[in-house]
Amino acid sequence: MAKSNEGLGTGLRTRHLTMMGLGSAIGAGLFLGTGVGIRAAGPAVLLAYIIAGAIVVLVMQMLGEMAAARPASGSFSRYGEDAFGHWAGFSLGWLYWFMLIMVMGAEMTGAAAIMGAWFGVEPWIPSLVCVVFFAVVNLVAVRGFGEFEYWFAFIKVAVIIAFLIIGIALIFGWLPGSTFVGTSNFIGDHGFMPNGISGVAAGLLAVAFAFGGIEIVTIAAAESDKPREAISLAVRAVIWRISVFYLGSVLVITFLMPYESINGADTAAESPFTQILAMANIPGTVGFMEAIIVLALLSAFNAQIYATSRLVFSMANRQDAPRVFSKLSTSHVPTNAVLLSMFFAFVSVGLQYWNPAGLLDFLLNAVGGCLIVVWAMITLSQLKLRKELQANDEISTVRMWAHPWLGILTLVLLAGLVALMLGDAASRSQVYSVAIVYGFLVLLSFVTVNSPLRGGRTPSDLN
């Protein structure tokens, strides 16, 4: 199938997509949240990361197969519609848009709190400046977004590699003042699995969503000059990112720190990354990690403005959103869609400070389960579309392994994750909240199918 980006630009290069593939999931969740999983499972959190990582690798391989065959700015929303019709594309697109909008607010609030403390100003000031700045970056041309994400990702990858090198040197006692630690912390008095299988299950719930946002690379690929090559490289990078960056970081932390001394971090000073850099007598570690955390949050925010605008643009072209959002500027940027993302970024940030009757709690709970729905629908879409893609000779650079068995295994693993969430009092509300939100969107898709928004066409007309 010929490349189709619906009139968008082609300013992204393979290097942009490859670096995005490496760095897109290296965020504040890794630097601040890793300790939550370690505290729950001890060193056995590695098993939780392996299980969660396997799910993500399989999902991305399936998504990569469809994206390489049919590059589209709507990505999995478009493939859901191709596979199951209007209801799937509509509900999946708006669900992911909702998820990113809510996460945008939380991330900007976190970054603004740190920057406000730096400059001695109210957090809303850096928040306003950053939202406007990244909106402008995304309004000018897609190349600007790509360059920012390239360098954001480059810095994050460089920091993780430096952390791994320093950590290994500390483990083997190669740095001044350090001694060989062996497995005294990794095994210690409590063993590899101090809290048993239940601890690993709790750890899995803590780390399962650490890889969220990885799907954005397939949205961006539609604006690449070589989408199939870019998608192939980005999908392959997923395995390296999980095995080296996540598993490597957790190995270093669990070898150097007793698991019972590790907790989830609310500040950079509490991050296990900061504490390990301090072991190496590196000065200014707290300030350095604060800067890296801010960079990670702003990188995610920039990517989410981009992804939400392209999703709305794609849905507008498919008549699942008002047509005004399909308008392109002379530089092939969906200006109105970017402005919509900017507006809701302000709304989402505002909700972080003004929480009417628990609305924010409900919305953020729904976000926790959105990824499971998205990953499940990606899997179902690939299982449904594979025969059609083969018949049309569309499968090219990326092919799902052991089809359909690994796809079925992915669904089983996702079902198991849902079962764990239902069995956990803290996670149960996430399942209920996303079920309400997604059910509402599915119903809305049937209500709007013959609305003026779609020009009175039926799904079969659109196909």
From Swiss-Prot:
GO terms for cellular component: plasma membrane. GO terms for biological process: amino acid transport; transmembrane transport. Its main location: membrane. Disruption phenotype: Mutants show reduced aromatic amino acids uptake. It is found in: Cell membrane. Pfam families: AA_permease. InterPro entries: AA-permease/SLC12A_dom (IPR004841), Amino_acid_permease_CS (IPR004840). Belongs to the amino acid-polyamine-organocation (APC) superfamily. Amino acid transporter (AAT) (TC 2.A.3.1) family. This is Aromatic amino acid transport protein AroP. It comes from Corynebacterium glutamicum (strain ATCC 13032 / DSM 20300 / JCM 1318 / BCRC 11384 / CCUG 27702 / LMG 3730 / NBRC 12168 / NCIMB 10025 / NRRL B-2784 / 534). The gene is aroP.
